[in-house]
From Swiss-Prot:
Binds 2 magnesium or manganese ions per subunit. It is an enzyme of class 6 (ligase). This is D-alanine--D-alanine ligase B. Pfam families: Dala_Dala_lig_C, Dala_Dala_lig_N. SUPFAM superfamilies: Glutathione synthetase ATP-binding domain-like, PreATP-grasp domain. Monomer. Transmembrane segments: none annotated. Its cofactor is Mg(2+); Mn(2+). The lineage of its organism: Bacteria, Pseudomonadati, Pseudomonadota, Gammaproteobacteria, Enterobacterales. The keyword Ligase applies.
Amino acid sequence: MADKIAVLLGGTSAERDVSLNSGAAVLAGLREGGINAHPVDPQEVDVAQLKAMGFQKVFIALHGRGGEDGTLQGMLELLGLPYTGSGVMASALSMDKLRSKLLWQGAGLPVAPWVALTRAEFEKGLSEEQKARISALGLPLIVKPSREGSSVGMTKVVEENALQGALSLAFQHDDEILIEKWLCGPEFTVAIVGEEILPSIRIQPAGTFYDYEAKYLSDETQYFCPAGLDASQEAALQSLVLQAWKALGCTGWGRIDVMLDSDGQFYLLEANTSPGMTSHSLVPMAARQAGMSFSQLVVRILELAD
């Protein structure tokens, strides 16, 4: 008898709506591939009961906290249920932009200059040294929560007097935030499925940057796959992404986002260990370019579950 597969979708994070869309698409794709798949929303069902409910494997279509931050992965490990995507450590590291950057920097990989702040430091008032370090980054800046996805809580700061508001917004979403030097782009993303690096995608948002609206709602965001890089640039990008992926210990499938600055240098932005799988999503787009249908993609991801 075929394995009974739980597709985890929805959840309780700020990315719930995106996850519901991802999960519905994954569910349809798995069923098209002949898989006995069923939707499970952790907001409504106690996922600690998955094994008792007769499930043999889990496809994680959750985004954000409680889904791709290592907590769920740890519980599934304890239950002895194979699941898609990266393990506990890689999931936790990838969700945490600050720790990802520290690890990549330590591995000698390029990341944008940044300053990290905690809520306690912000509430106490920034020291002169912190102000000087932020000032040294120049303008514009990008302010982002360390552990939030889908560009939630992110702001581009073009004038110094807008920084305070941007910090306040980011701290609504996390206790730790990043203030980064603005890289002028373009932005690229590279998906990995198993050992296969899929063709890179160049992202061209209509607005200032690739924010929540550009990712999920706008029809004006343009995606180019192939990305239009020459062969040596594409090879350099793929090599960097693979090094970044391995440094974090990622497995299964995922995506690494990268920015090409005006100096011609690629800089790592972040890793996504449970990327979106909606109609606007990038991993399915790259898979299509590589000759893989959506159904083939989700079945392949499920096969990689351990």
